[in-house]
Amino acid sequence: MDFLEIVGQVPLKGGVEISGAKNSALPILAATLLSRQEVKIKSLPQVADIKAMALLLQNLGAELEWLNPHTLQLSTKSLHHTEATYDLVRKMRASILVLGPLLARFKECLVSLPGGCAIGARPVDLHLKAMQQLGAEIKIEQGYIHAKAPKGLKGNDILFDKISVTGTENALMAASLAKGITRIINAAKEPEIAQLCAFLQSGGVEIEGVGSSELKIRGVESDALNLKDIQIIPDRIEAGTYLCVGAITNSQLKINRIIPNHIQAITDKLIEIGFSLDIQENSIEIYPAKKRQAFEITTKEYPGFPTDMQAQFMALATQCLGTSIIEETLFENRFMHASELQRLGANISLKTNVATISGSTELTGSDVMATDLRASSALVLAALVAKGVSRVHRIYHLDRGYERLEDKINALGAKVLRLKEK
């Protein structure tokens, strides 16, 4: 198992290029199960979750060829298998995304209940209810979801009691081959969903309301789609994380290949804290702040402040003057990084879903342990400003969502080594 050894308080400067969005690539890879023709997907990030999804598709019978490290050509026209097994699905929760497309195209499938980050309840009930609304029969048998729709899926209204990104994506993919019109009410509005809509539209699916909380889908009257090649949008969470690298070290950094509109909640908060930003069409440059002020954040669904940036801003709060407050409204048990930041010297108190951080605090290098994907990046951020050497363990969490993180940070001047545990 690998860990990162990080020398703190090293000056940083330069630019970093953002990879393709993992959270856009995963549903788009799953959506290829709806296609009968070869599809090329560009700008895929080389991260563990993408490799796991590619392996799952291959296991289902997809033909895959990596044309370069970030471009995958795949064909699902000769799928021979509609069972997503536990040994593959357990590696990440996003595997549930194959449920909708497999059911829509083949009228029956077996999908293992998923794994992934341990950050509270992420019930699959919303997915199952959506499939049932489209006419599927669902049974849970020995840890597997057994879904059947012998006569095919039929368009219907799907009302999500709670906004769900992957739930919306699964419903979209299933509805694309359902007979008639489906309305998804209380849909998630993330940019990754907008890109999935564009991908499905390239295959002939009519979708209205893209970017809003109500989507109207007219299914294609066919047993498969003819999807076109696509390039994955830049990863807004990776972009936000590298802006936080600049912010926590108070460095001048340029973040390239991004869509600034996708991270406005993040940039607005950085400006409020005291940073100057030069926002261009596809880049943002952050400049050192004279004084970093404490702040308040409440995580919300897009376009609100993203829960996936909460941990990074908690690390940043340790270097801001005053008392910062972070309220997590989307997931329970998502403050596991707080105790690890405390090991570095952070002054954090927790009360249910609210964290109070007192700053500015001098952090000191220590051994810390990553507990989930975004928590791991927060520990790296804190280690960059801690006095002395820190070691971040269990970085397999980090590898799930960040491409070559140590290489990108080292290119800015940092001293980060990837080493093997003894």
Swiss-Prot record:
Where in the sequence is the active site?
C117 (proton donor)
Q: Give one GO molecular function term.
A: UDP-N-acetylglucosamine 1-carboxyvinyltransferase activity
| Keyword Cell cycle attached | yes
The biological pathway it contributes to is: Cell wall biogenesis; peptidoglycan biosynthesis
Keywords assigned by UniProt, alphabetized = Cell cycle, Cell division, Cell shape, Cell wall biogenesis/degradation, Cytoplasm, Peptidoglycan synthesis, Pyruvate, Transferase
Q: Where in the cell is it found?
A: Cytoplasm
- Short name of any one Pfam family annotated for the protein: EPSP_synthase
Which positions bear 2-(S-cysteinyl)pyruvic acid O-phosphothioketal? C117
Residues binding phosphoenolpyruvate = K22, N23
**GO cellular component term, pick one:** cytoplasm
Return the EC number. Answer: 2.5.1.7
Catalyses: phosphoenolpyruvate + UDP-N-acetyl-alpha-D-glucosamine = UDP-N-acetyl-3-O-(1-carboxyvinyl)-alpha-D-glucosamine + phosphate
- Record-listed UDP-N-acetyl-alpha-D-glucosamine binding positions: R93, R122, P123, V124, D125, L126, D308, L330
GO biological process: one example:
cell division
Q: Per the similarity annotation, which family is this?
A: Belongs to the EPSP synthase family. MurA subfamily.
What this protein is reported to do is described as: Cell wall formation. Adds enolpyruvyl to UDP-N-acetylglucosamine.
PANTHER family from the UniProt entry? UDP-N-ACETYLGLUCOSAMINE 1-CARBOXYVINYLTRANSFERASE (PTHR43783:SF1)
Q: What protein am I looking at? A: UDP-N-acetylglucosamine 1-carboxyvinyltransferase
Please give the organism. Helicobacter pylori (strain HPAG1)
- UniProt gene name: murA
